[in-house]
A protein has these predicted regions:
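N-terminal Rossmann-like FAD-binding beta1-loop-alpha1 element of flavoenzymes
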Residues: 127-153
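Ferredoxin-type iron-sulfur electron-transfer modules and their immediate structural context
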Residues: 1-123
């Protein structure tokens, strides 16, 4: 284990895995299931952690680094009441980096889970939508629509 991995493990161990999940329910605008992806990463299950994140986010490598965590998920963390909150952004970035090292990608994750969505995909196939905005929300919307066979145009 490298020193960096040791520090990340310490950050993950600091998470209480709350049942109410204020970091996810109140803090994260995407609703990322933060305690679950941290739990999987702690157990060394990077693919499961990455799959959990990719259910709600297509930009974990970016969001893990540039999201205003202190105002959002980390700002809602129970640990922050009496001390430092869990360093969620660093953990999310670590999961993304490890997933890339292991050759995981959103395409592979979606292909693995696509059989459940075939009926919905058939209904939506060939539909077109316009999305106003090319920021994280617009790009995420476009990616999830594309997964379901919808052609989107970002303006």
């Amino acid at each position: 284990i490298t020193f960096t991995e040791y520090l990340i493990q310490e950050k993950m161990n600091y998470c209480l895995n709350c049942k109410i999940k204020p970091c996810s329910n109140k803090g994260c605008p995407l609703g990322n299931d933060i305690p679950t992806f941290i739990k999987f990463a702690k157990e060394g299950k990077i693919e499961d952690a990455y799959t959990t994140i990719s259910k709600t986010s297509v930009l974990p490598g970016i969001c893990g680094r540039v999201c205003p965590h202190k105002k959002q998920c980390e700002g809602s963390c129970v640990r922050g009441i009496t001390g430092d909150s869990v360093d969620i952004g660093t953990i999310e970035s670590y999961i993304f980096d490890k997933a890339m090292e292991q050759g995981l990608s959103l395409k592979k994750i979606y292909e693995k889970n696509c059989e459940q969505d075939n009926e919905k995909r058939e209904i939506l196939k060939g539909k077109k939508v316009a999305i106003i905005g090319g920021g994280p929300a617009g790009l995420t919307s476009a990616a999830f629509l594309a997964k379901d066979g919808v052609r989107s145009y970002n303006f």
